[in-house]
């Protein structure tokens, strides 16, 4: 179906259908519960359902203590499989994801599903650090009767430390690179090589790369860049 609703309205639909429950856990409690050993198929680091079985009295006690609840999905589902352009098929158990934060704001996973559907987004290209969220979003789309987009999760650019490339690594903007003698054309060539669109040392222009682009041939491992030298490490 086409989506013309706001994320909070779609969250209310799931709530009215009995597919949610209030969660009073603090972030610290969630971290501790997620890191503790537990039975069942819940993946490491996922919310283990601490507040799922609270009685009305227990909920009232938490409300009286001044704990505003978040709203969580009661995700009674087995592994959810998604098909990614680069990663292929992969599956994960969906945990009880937050739909509405305890300040009343729709949470990311619900918001991105509803907003993308409302805007007619049918292709999503993003960093592979978000791949683990995709089964959650696929399950939410299915519950809401919304179409799943096509996903393509691309590897990140990392700094020499192996962490995600960031401003703290320095020389990540064109002016900073230009000050090191790295031209815009040099940047284009470095990027082309990293995407397997050109060979090292091959002179290329942007127009040359259009016909070479093929999503399924893109690399699936991170690319490490030394921003101080403007050179690719891997």
Language-model-detected regions and their locations in the chain:
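Conserved catalytic-core subdomain
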Residues: 161-234
């Amino acid at each position: 179906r086409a989506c013309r609703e706001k994320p909070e309205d779609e969250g209310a639909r799931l709530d009215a259908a009995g597919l949610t429950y209030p969660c009073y856990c603090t972030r610290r409690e969630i971290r501790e519960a997620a890191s503790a050993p537990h039975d069942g198929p819940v993946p490491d680091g996922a919310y283990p359902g601490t507040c799922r079985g609270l009685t009305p009295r227990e909920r009232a006690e938490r409300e009286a203590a001044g704990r505003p609840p978040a709203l969580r999905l009661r995700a009674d589902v087995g592994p959810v499989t998604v098909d990614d352009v680069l990663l292929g098929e992969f599956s994960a158990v969906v945990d009880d994801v937050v739909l509405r934060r305890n300040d009343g704001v729709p949470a990311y996973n619900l918001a991105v599903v509803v907003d993308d559907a409302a805007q007619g987004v049918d292709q999503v290209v993003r960093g592979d650090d978000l791949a683990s969220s995709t089964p959650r979003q696929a399950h939410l789309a299915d519950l809401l009767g919304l179409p799943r987009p096509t996903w393509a999760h691309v590897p990140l650019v990392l700094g020499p430390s192996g962490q995600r490339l960031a401003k703290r690594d320095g020389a990540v903007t064109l002016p900073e690179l230009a000050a090191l003698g790295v031209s815009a054309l040099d940047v284009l060539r470095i990027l082309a090589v990293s995407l397997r669109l050109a060979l090292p040392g091959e002179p290329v222009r942007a127009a040359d790369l259009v016909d070479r682009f093929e999503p399924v041939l893109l690399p699936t491992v991170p690319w490490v860049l030394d921003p101080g030298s403007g050179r690719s490490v891997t």
